[in-house]
Amino acid sequence: RVVVPAAAPVAALVKQVTRNWAGNPLVLDPRDMASEEFTATKRAAFRAADVALAASGTVSLELAAVNTPMVIAYDMNWISRQIIGRMLRVDTVTLVNLVSETRVVPEFIGANCRPGPIAEGVLQVLRAPGAQKDAMALTMQRLGQGGEAPGLRAARAVLARM
């Protein structure tokens, strides 16, 4: 089953676009529940997923935190592609790839964000979901999962610089 956690500003559009999709996808709409309930439901959906197709950004860290293999896809308008393409100095934009210093999470960014290649990327991840597990674990370890609270780590880092 397809589950789509939608952001509040686009939830109505997501519901409209997915209304006639095969399999009757479930759209999680944050406007329909309390913030804590939405967050818990979204995390449960992430945890239960065989694979996630996600936009680039912090969602890749949310997926890594629950060990869910992913494919990243994100497009932007032409002028943004041109500007950002000239500014980027890295060969990946996915946080899991950057933090783990790997390239195991497939990315379809800008002009490469097309249905055919994305679908093939999702199928490849479904065939070999374990390929991302080590990178996700390393990412979470480097970000301090299971260690001190983030606020305490940040305070210690600031104090160490003083």
Report each predicted region and the residues it spans.
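Nucleotide-activated sugar donor-binding and catalytic core shared by glycosyltransferases
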Residues: 1-162
